[in-house]
Regions:
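Conserved substrate/cofactor phosphate-moiety recognition/catalytic segment
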Residues: 20-65
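Conserved phosphate-donor/acceptor-positioning beta-strand/loop module used by diverse small-molecule
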Residues: 82, 97-118, 146
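Hydrophobic anchor at the beta1->P-loop junction of P-loop NTPases
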Residues: 8
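Walker A/P-loop
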Residues: 17
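ATP-binding Walker
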Residues: 14
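P-loop (Walker A) phosphate-binding loop of NTP-binding proteins
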Residues: 11
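Glycine-rich phosphate-binding loop used to anchor ATP phosphates in small-molecule kinases
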Residues: 56-99
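Small-molecule kinase domains that catalyze NTP-dependent phosphoryl transfer to phosphate-bearing small molecules
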Residues: 119-162, 167
Length: 172
């Protein structure tokens, strides 16, 4: 049976980084990865920013699919934290080894998101508005949601763990 990808998504300001940090501290058997962890090195390799050059997003996604495949080859389960949505994965194309994708959305209300993003250095109003639009798109695309305005990062991490355990309980 082909392994599945387990993806935790959320628009900017959704609390992905805080939830990921708390999830890693749980020391679960799952291996967590943030799409940004290879961003600087991949940009250096590509000679362009993978953060802003849309022509590099497909190859960067393909690189991550191979990293995640390596985890599965070692008999482990990876969970991938990314702002991507299902249409992004469709555009890249799922790799042949992948048996499907399970999605979990971290989300919060627009006011909370706006406050979080405005507190970040360098965030403009246009960037905040784009993040709000991204959040609305994700709400339409992903059914399973954890509200990070209602949960602490530790509670969100616990919800992520419960989601993973429910989906993988027959695989162990």
């Amino acid at each position: 049976m082909k392994p599945k990808l387990y993806v935790v998504t959320g628009a900017p300001g959704s609390g992905k980084s805080a939830a990921l940090d708390a999830f890693v501290r749980l020391r679960t058997p799952y291996l967590a990865f943030d799409i940004d962890w290879l961003g600087v090195v991949a940009s250096d390799l590509a000679g362009r920013s993978i953060f802003f050059d849309r022509s590099k997003w497909g190859p960067y996604g393909a690189l991550w699919f191979e990293v995640l495949h390596s985890v599965f080859r070692n008999g482990r389960v990876a969970v991938f934290f990314t702002p991507n949505d299902p249409s992004d994965f469709e555009a890249i194309g799922l790799p042949a080894w992948c048996g499907g994708v399970e999605w979990l959305l971290l989300d919060c209300g627009d006011v909370v998101r706006s406050d979080r993003l405005r507190a970040r250095p360098g965030w403009t109003e246009a960037m905040v508005e784009e993040a709000i639009e991204d959040a609305r798109s994700l709400l339409q695309a992903v059914a399973k949601i954890v509200d990070t305005a209602e949960h602490t990062p530790a509670q969100a991490a616990g919800a992520i763990l419960a989601w993973l355990e429910a989906l993988t309980s027959g695989d162990r």
